[in-house]
Amino acid sequence: MIFGRPGSLVGAALYKEILMTDSARRINLGAIDCAPRPHLPDGFRRNSVRIGPTLGAERSGLSVYELPPGQAVGPYHYEEPEEEWLLVVSGTPTLRHPEGEERLEPWDIVFFPAGPAGAHLVRNNSDKSARVAMFSSSGATVGAVVYPDSDLVWVWTADDAVDMVVKRSSKVDDIAPWIADRNETET
């Protein structure tokens, strides 16, 4: 997908095409009301809304986060096999990534590849609210979110009932030989 401002040549063509297509679904990121998430711990108390399902998306996602000062979208993490994009709509959030931290500005776009190179945390260290949009691929039926700071892995599937969060350092020695054997015998 190509991202651009409506005033740019590429952005204008894409923007016009989407708005004039009868089957396209449109929403204004600045006009969305984000729902409070008071159950989240301090440091992650954000308002948010998942827009992808609302617009009928089945293989991609879009969530909008309103970050009060001192709050983050979530813990430092990366995903497998998902890719993500971040668009700063307003404010100046701070992005933590594998090479350090940097302050972002409105209209900044950041791409996070799947895997450790795409690890990130978005926090609002400013004294004013910030709004960001996160786009993600979501065609996989099984995946994992790895939280390096807490040594946790969230394994998700198409069935929420079998999703789980586990410690990466947990040992499952009794099953390891079976997995190795399975990988060698199946082609």
Please provide the spans of the model-predicted regions:
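A short, N-terminal "cap"/entry segment at the start of jelly-roll beta-barrel domains
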Residues: 11-59, 147-149, 154-187
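Ligand-binding loop in jelly-roll beta-barrel domains
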Residues: 114-142
